[in-house]
Amino acid sequence: MLEKQIIHSFVSIVGEDNVDTSNMGRLTYSYDATPNFQAMPDAVIAPRNTNEVAEVLKICNTHKIPVYVRGSGTNLCAGTCPLEGGIVLIFRHMNNILEIDEENLTITVQAGVITLDIIKAVEEKSLFYPPDPSSMKISTIGGNINENSGGLRGLKYGVTRDYVMGLELVLPNGDIIRTGGKLAKDVAGYDLTRLFIGSEGTLGVVTEAILKLVPMPETKKTMLALYEDINEAARAVSSIIANKIIPATLEFLDQPTIEVVEEFAQIGLPTDVKAILLIEQDGPPEVVNRDIEKMANVCRSMNAVDVRIAKDEAEADALRTARRSALSALARLKPTTILEDATVPRSQIAPMVEAINAIAKKYNIPICTFGHAGDGNLHPTCMTDARNEEEMHRAEQAFAEIFAKAIELDGTITGEHGVGAMKAPYLEMKLGKEGIAAMQGIKQAFDPNNIMNPGKMFAKDTRKRVVVER
């Protein structure tokens, strides 16, 4: 627990109403969306501005108090779980859109702004912020930046880092710096902006961001391709890209996922096929119509049993909603849902899907697979019960093999969820000892007292695991 004098110091900075040391308050921020990770912080602090963040960090750095920066807690790698106590920083007061600059096509926001609020705000001005993580109704832009979040539109439009032009940051020692700006070109010094994107709160605190916008696409169309053979569906993904078409969305759902999603969303998805590709294209009408026709022909040539084009925006929106509800639908089946994001080059989608199915059979565990097939980002999802230790051990072994297979296929252990505590034991598989050492050097340079999100990225326990006991 924190000393009373330190608590009083925090209160003097942010006000009594913004320091919570109650059991209920601390319990609320002791876990995130990751199953079976939980640890109590000593206090929850809600700063009102960047200067207050800086003053809080100065105290924490002096007394070596762990700091866990938290958005809405939607991350799936135990990235915000306060494993070593200390304080959780929340941004309920720092949640304002500061400026929409139509001349420079930028939006400036505080870290606590909800992602969907950004998307809606710029849509009113016929502008477009493309990153669309499935959690966008809840997640904050600060969380998106720290995790470098992706989304359904990542294939065509990229991920969060492709839209962050500048940041306001507070370093662990309390220094406030600004990186980047409203510039199309800027090569002055190291690219600190990109260094902090995806750093998972281990290097400092993001308080503001300047984000790039693009013009709103003129139109869009959505289609479904249905397959009796899951491998043919996977091969169709590579074939579409090989035909020089980059759709806005190219999603994959296997049969178990389809059945659960249809029961949940009830939009008329066919449940008697082995796989579905959900494909969307946007842009000028002539380009959209041409590409949809081409992709339909490609899917048919890859033995799709049917290709269906949404008749109107309402039907298209229902299909998008169904895909975004996959995790919610699957999570209803059993008490514990392990959602992973092994990612491979899109040319390796078919062998990766085959491997996931073989591994699930080998360990006798249910794994449903869906995800952003167009960029190789698959979500093998296991429905289990953490109270069943024997089954959990099998799940642990299965995911270890899935990660190893992704690496074997020139992929990665995580495409968008991040490393956090859950994936830390696997990071060396991807980077090697030398890569880990390079990252530790960066960490030491910015945060020599290791106050920022300790217990994440760098594994203290070499045991491979997907969950830990409370």
Residue ranges and their predicted role:
Residues M1-R470:
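Noncatalytic alpha-helical scaffold of FAD-dependent oxidoreductases
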